[in-house]
Every structure is written in C-alpha cells, then in structure tokens.
C-alpha cells in the first residue's frame, strides 16, 4: 500500500546510535551537513525530541516539542535540513505512555490494565488501550499537529515492549479477552488514518521490543526495522530468516558504528555496507566522528547501493549460504526476472587455516546463456557452468582474495 511500495527508499541517516538522547538542534544540523555532502538523502530524528525526555524514564504520550533540545522549534530544524537538499523524518512510539507524562497524570485509566492488579513496567513505560477510540483520537491529534507543523516525509513508528495485564477499563468482565483483537484493530485504525491523510509520508514500522514484524504491519508500512541488533554478522541470520517470509525491500537495515553498540564487534565498513544492501539501506552512526577512511567510502557505498537496488528489490532472491549449519560463511544471490544479470554476495565470517578455496554454485541463471563477471568482461562462462561447476571464492594467499574474519565480496554477472 502507498506510493513507496515499489519505489526505491531514501537513503537515510538515523541519529539514535549517534547520539541516543543527548542531542540538540545544532548537533542534528551538524550531522545533516556532513551527511548531505556524502550523498545521504534523509535525516531521521529518533527518540528524545518530545515532552521533557532526556532518558527512557518519561514523556511517552506527550507528543509536543521539547523546547530545551529543539531551540527554534521543529520547523526551523526541518527547514535547515531541507535547505541542505535532504528530507526529514521523525520517531514516534504512539502506542506507549510513560508514568511520568502529562498524559498519564490526566488519564491513568488509558493504560492497558486489569483492575486490582499492579501494572508491569517495561522500558519504563505502559501500553495505551488502543481499543478505545478516544485514546486513538487523542494520539492522532497530537501526531497531526507535529506532522502539519513542518515538512516531515518519514515516520518511524516504534514499539519497545510487549503487552502485559491485557485488560481494558471500559470492557465488561466477560469481554476482557477480546482486548487482544480490539487492540490490533485500533492500531490498524490509526495507521490507516495516517497513511490516508499523509500518503506522501514513508511509514516505517519498528518493533524491536514487541516482535511485531508481520503482514498486518506490512500492509500499512512498506518497510519494517528488523532489529536493534545492527551488527553485520548478527544480521546475517536475522535477515536470512526474515527474508523467508518477507521481501528484502521491507527489511530495515543500516550501516552502524563500530565497535557495534550491541555486541562490541568490529567489522569492516565494506562488509557492513554489503549486508545492509540486502535491505532498505541507511546509516546509524555519527558521520561527524567516524574514521576518515570510513567517511570517505560512503559515496562509493551509496553508488553501489543505487546500482544494485532495483535488482535487490525486484529480482529473485536465492539463499546460498547456510549460516545456521556452518557459521564460517554466508552467501546470497539476486537474479533479474529476465535472467539478464545476477548479483552474488559473499561474507567470510571466520577465516580458517589450511582450508581449500570454496567453490559455490550459483542459482537461477539461464543455462544456455553466457555470462561474464563485470570486472572480467573477456571471461565468458555459461549459466550451466556457473550453476553446476560454480565459482571459486579465492583465499587470501593469491593476493586478491578474502583475508581474515568478517570480510565480504560481491560479484556482478551480466548476460552476454
């Protein structure tokens, strides 16, 4: 649904892992200035811009601008980002409410609850009762004021906890078990209003805490954030599994900082880019502080993503590696519908001593046609040979192969 369903998505940079809650207008503009020079197309302001939110202890439900952080207001920030030629996106967690919020003080009964039982805090927040129209109307009204106040072109809709004490203050006892269903219908209702009233806005669902990457969400949002675990090696299994049910174009995937903030692992910038290319592609880091070598490689990384994005979005996807069986390597392939080209990607997770070069068989090619790898146009190989004899993934001793842990390689095959 929506105009982005079949379109290439903007290459965004999200400030979450760059700043967490510690940001202001000047910091976001600094990130945007550097990002715009590198070819990044959108700045997304994540959690911490509303209420009086300096940590996860407050303000969910108070969807008005935190003036202490955004001096000059939201429109000023968005206008400054737009002047750089970039789009602007914003984070909401519309289903949640903090005990320390104006909304909870005014309407404590709006939280999902079972009468007589204490409410369970998770990430210092409760869940709003979306079975109630007055709750949805209030949240939508606050979101609408924000969206109408500036040129916002993307929403990240987050959900950072599961449901507990699943009951409603308005339902009779014999109908309390309906709340699970009524709640989801309420979420759909609000998303429907958003996507109807703002069809130009790209809606990305995000549910690291609620584990809600599902077809219902995909109807309203053409992309969903896979996981807050952004480590490239962790993402191999995450994205492999997600792609079994959902198109790669729906998988939110970013190049993040190193050491990775979740697992502490260092991986090459190139590998992080190759893994993120399988999904929507973007950046989750502070471009003003990363090593110069990494910063300098971003324009070429973006160029590579743009070159192959249509093939990734519309081609046939083949999972060639078996990370769940042999966690030393992974590989995948995208083949154009007309079999005119194929993109093969390989990640060496762990280097091993005295191991033979791997021979990997491609899939989905035209058996009787001939193909050449983009960097070797004079070397033509039949599709049958590529699929039955395979290709040799060179090892480090020949001078041009893969060296060490966490390295990657892509090969682009073109039909003659």
Residue spans of the language-model regions?
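Carbohydrate-binding surface patches
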Residues: 324-366
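Aromatic-lined carbohydrate-binding/catalytic grooves of carbohydrate-active enzymes
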Residues: 4-144, 154
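Conserved, mostly hydrophobic/aromatic
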Residues: 13, 43, 81, 139, ...
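Flexible loop/turn segments at secondary-structure boundaries
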Residues: 19-22, 50-56, 95-101, 161-166, ...
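Catalytic cores of secreted or luminal carbohydrate-active enzymes
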Residues: 270-321
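Glycan-recognition surfaces
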Residues: 103-137, 181-288
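Short acidic/histidine-rich active-site segments
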Residues: 47, 153-165, 199, 204-213
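C-terminal beta-sandwich/jelly-roll accessory domains of carbohydrate-active enzymes
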Residues: 350-416
